[in-house]
């Protein structure tokens, strides 16, 4: 039975001696009740006052009209909490008038403002009310006096006897811990047995409200008061609930309880549902999740929940801490056990054949499964014969039924899941039934189990070896090569070893760590993917480039037919020449029309004819020293350079010798670059005869590399305020930014290190950007027929030195490696030194040439 707390409340009109009160308590339990005249008058006054209180009140504005007025003339229902003090004074005056002024035990009321439950109440404390809104107002209106006395007494309590068990209440029926209280009220806490005549009013309330919150009330964590754990708040709520219960039930029983319990007997206050009453403990609000919480309560609730979750997480980490660091015990010094590589590796050891995770039947082939089943059947027959003597003690019918059921239900599962052949285990004798001793029973069982273990281990070893022998042919090539060299036994190669050995490392070397191997393989595969993507992109660009070249070749012929010297044709030609070089069929014709128009004025008027110079050479005896110089020039500037092919026809060398001799005896004489121009034009299919080569080389030297162009090149490239000085404003070019390294002669050193295709492409670009619009500004033979070359050059020759300067800047910024400066570039002994790079692959060579021309175009646009 749940312990009930009986609180005796002595009226504040009397002051009892503690000893006398104990005696009176014992007498009241055994004697009938007697009332004096003063006591009857006080009970009648109390009854009228309680009857005048309203049954229920709402917190709305209409509560003022429905409230009644007590005998003292004050409105109790609508008064403020601070008015309780005046109400107490009025009550004391009435009591003094009834009992008389001679009573020395009448206490003096202390002016303490009562504590209102409205400021901290979080849920209803009323039991029988129909609406929730009336709960707080009713309990406040009817329990002002009792709540004042309860709050004052709560501050003076020392011991809370309510939470003691019923067993102590039986042995100690009357325990009244007293303490001097403040003047105004005395609170006595007494434990008594249940009396029907004393608690007829309050027992029903207690039995109604105790079962709902029995566990929470019995827990001392529900309220905390300094020095009084869980006592004051419970007493206050009990007083408020019982007063509310009495005021709401207007019956004779109520009047009887009011008259008897108010004056003579202590009030029994019910235990009500008080989730949070004057307590700051977080544990109080945790069980009441349906209660509307204040912000501070929600904060403490979240804080408590976070602390609990953190404790659980720490507890789980501490629980599994040892399992996470098991591998640390395997380390010896600085060497991890996983890096021990010189021990033969096998998938299953002799002690691990019982584990099911490492042995997977599904990886075995159908033939091996059938072979294992045949071996299993044969050995089962042998084992059955050997253990026939021990099986006689068991019922044959049970053995047949059990073995058949076991074989039919577990045969497939045993082969797939278990490494042990449990059906090979013979039925053992039953101790106590079969005539077999305990020692014999244990020996037979151990013998049978040992045979099963040995047989299972042998069978697994045979199956693994047979599987390895069949998978020898499917091993990687690295293992086969190692086996042929005597470094590997293919029968010892297991799946674990296949996983440990990397394909990028020989099998006889120590295996890499798993994480390292995984990381390196990932990086290798990533680089391979990038390389493959780059190669695919290059192939795509190469295909697009081939299509573009075919289109440009068609455009060349179309522009030539339309008129290459037109302004529109010339502008379009200057665009596509950076993408595709001129083809051999149209190169000679385009060169001639762009530099001297269709009438070939320069060739006819200002260049010596090939026949005249040839006749002059045949008539004269060419000087030997001059011939020696020409041979040295061919060997140094042609045969030792990258563009010279070892399989070059000797006729080309002899023709080059002849053309250089002719040039040396002509009016212009030998100039820088003649040997390279003659050699490349002789080896190219664009120029068929020596005459065409002679005329074209002289035409290019007189127009594109004239004296005026060379002078501008030498002066502008060294201009400290020019774009070249801005681009070359680096410490690396400090020693070569001078006239000795940067001039028109060293410019030809760049062309010495280019192959034939790039050299011809460079000539195409230079000639196209030196072309003139002869369609709009034609050249008339009559005007310049009798004029000197200098006059014609000043009128009709374009000096485009920027195309030469941009080529120099491109080489210095992007291809300046392997040499100190352009002057020393011609003295390099490496024949394979090439600009941009040396390669024998024609596809790669074309790609490099495209990149070179793109950079050249970039710097040319900056200089324009």
From Swiss-Prot:
GO biological processes: fungal-type cell wall organization; protein transport
One Pfam family this sequence matches: SBE2_C
Record keywords, A-Z: Cell wall biogenesis/degradation, Golgi apparatus, Phosphoprotein, Protein transport, Transport
Low complexity: compositionally biased ranges: 51-71, 123-139
Modified residues (Phosphoserine): 82-83, 450, 532
Region of interest (Disordered), ranges: 16-84, 123-142, 213-235
Major subcellular location class: Golgi
Annotated signal sequence range: none
Function description: With SBE22, is involved in cell wall integrity and polarity processes like bud growth, through the transport of CHS3 and UTR2 to sites of growth.
Protein family (similarity comment): Belongs to the SBE2 family.
Protein's recorded name: Protein SBE2
Native source organism of the sequence: Saccharomyces cerevisiae (strain YJM789)
């Amino acid at each position: 039975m749940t312990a009930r707390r009986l609180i005796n409340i002595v009226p504040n009109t009397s002051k009892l001696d503690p000893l006398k009160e104990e005696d009176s308590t014992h007498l009241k339990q055994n004697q009938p009740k007697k009332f004096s005249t003063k006591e009857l008058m006080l009970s009648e006054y109390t009854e009228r006052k309680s009857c005048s209180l309203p049954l229920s009140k709402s917190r709305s504005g209409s509560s003022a009209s429905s409230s009644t007025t007590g005998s003292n003339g004050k409105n109790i229902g609508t008064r403020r909490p601070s008015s309780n003090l005046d109400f107490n004074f009025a009550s004391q005056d009435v009591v003094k008038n009834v009992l008389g002024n001679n009573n020395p035990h009448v206490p003096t009321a202390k002016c303490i403002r009562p504590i209102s439950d409205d400021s901290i109440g979080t849920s209803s404390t009323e039991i029988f009310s129909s609406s929730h809104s009336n709960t707080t107002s009713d309990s406040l209106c009817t329990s002002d006096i009792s709540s004042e006395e309860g709050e004052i007494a709560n501050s003076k309590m020392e011991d809370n006897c309510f939470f003691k068990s019923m067993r102590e209440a039986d042995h100690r029926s009357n325990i009244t811990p007293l303490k001097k209280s403040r003047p105004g009220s005395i609170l006595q806490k007494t434990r008594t047995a249940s009396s029907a005549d004393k608690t007829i009013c309050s027992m029903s309330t207690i039995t109604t409200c105790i079962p709902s919150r029995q566990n929470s009330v019995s827990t001392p964590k529900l309220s905390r008061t300094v020095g009084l754990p869980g006592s004051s708040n419970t007493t206050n709520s009990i007083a408020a609930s019982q007063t509310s219960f009495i005021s709401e039930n207007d019956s004779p029983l109520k009047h009887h309880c009011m008259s008897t319990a108010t004056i003579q007997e202590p009030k029994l206050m019910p235990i009500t549902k008080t989730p949070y009453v004057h307590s700051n403990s977080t544990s109080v609000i945790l069980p009441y999740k349906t209660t509307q919480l204040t912000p501070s309560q929600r904060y403490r609730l979240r804080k408590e929940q976070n602390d609990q979750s953190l404790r659980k997480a720490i507890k789980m980490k501490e629980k599994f801490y040892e399992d996470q660091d098991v591998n640390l015990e395997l380390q010896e010094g600085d060497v991890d056990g996983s890096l021990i590589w010189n021990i033969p590796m096998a998938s299953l050891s002799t002690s691990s054949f019982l584990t099911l995770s490492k042995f997977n039947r599904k990886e075995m082939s159908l033939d091996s499964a059938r072979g294992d089943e045949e071996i299993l059947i044969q050995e089962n027959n042998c084992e059955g014969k050997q253990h026939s003597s021990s099986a006689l003690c068991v019922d044959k019918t049970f053995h047949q039924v059990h073995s058949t059921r076991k074989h039919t239900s577990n045969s497939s599962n045993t082969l797939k899941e278990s490494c042990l052949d449990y059906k090979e285990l013979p039925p053992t004798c039953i101790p106590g039934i079969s005539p077999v001793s305990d020692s014999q029973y244990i020996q037979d069982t151990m013998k049978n189990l040992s045979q099963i273990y040995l047989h299972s281990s042998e069978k697994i070893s045979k199956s693994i070896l047979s599987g390895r022998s069949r998978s020898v042919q499917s091993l990687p090539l690295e293992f086969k090569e190692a086996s042929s060299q005597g470094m590997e036994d293919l029968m010892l190669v297991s799946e674990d070893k296949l996983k440990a050995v990397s394909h990028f490392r020989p099998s006889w070397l120590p295996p890499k760590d798993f994480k390292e191997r995984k990381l390196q393989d990932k990086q290798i595969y990533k680089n391979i993917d990038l390389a493959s993507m780059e190669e695919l992109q290059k192939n795509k660009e190469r295909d697009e480039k081939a299509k573009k070249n075919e289109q440009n070749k068609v455009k060349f012929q179309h522009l030539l037919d339309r008129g290459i010297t037109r302004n529109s044709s010339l502008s379009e030609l200057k665009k596509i020449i950076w993408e595709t070089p001129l083809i051999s069929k149209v190169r000679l014709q385009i060169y001639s029309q762009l530099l001297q128009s269709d009438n070939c004025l320069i060739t006819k008027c200002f260049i010596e004819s090939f026949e005249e110079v040839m006749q002059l050479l045949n008539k004269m005896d060419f000087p030997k020293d001059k011939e020696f110089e020409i041979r040295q020039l061919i060997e140094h500037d042609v045969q030792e350079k990258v563009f010279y092919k070892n399989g070059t026809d000797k006729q080309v060398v002899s023709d080059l010798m002849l053309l250089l001799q002719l040039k040396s005896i002509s009016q212009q004489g030998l100039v820088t670059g003649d040997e390279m121009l003659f050699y490349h034009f002789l080896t190219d299919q664009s120029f068929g005869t020596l005459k065409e080569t002679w005329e074209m080389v002289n035409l290019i030297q007189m127009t594109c590399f004239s004296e005026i162009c060379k002078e501008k090149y030498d002066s502008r490239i060294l201009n400290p305020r020019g774009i070249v000085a801005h681009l070359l404003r680096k410490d690396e070019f400090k020693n070569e930014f001078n006239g000795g390294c940067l001039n028109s002669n060293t410019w030809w050193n760049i062309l010495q290190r280019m192959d034939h295709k790039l050299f011809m492409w460079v000539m195409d670009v230079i000639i196209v950007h030196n072309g003139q619009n002869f369609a709009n500004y034609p050249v008339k033979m009559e005007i310049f027929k009798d004029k000197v070359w200098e006059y014609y050059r000043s009128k009709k020759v374009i000096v485009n030195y920027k195309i030469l300067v941009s080529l120099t800047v491109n080489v210095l910024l992007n291809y300046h490696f392997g040499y100190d400066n352009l002057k020393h570039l011609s003295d390099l002994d490496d024949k394979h030194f090439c600009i941009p790079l040396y390669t024998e692959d024609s596809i790669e060579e074309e790609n490099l040439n495209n990149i070179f021309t793109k950079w050249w175009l970039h710097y040319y646009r900056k200089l324009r």
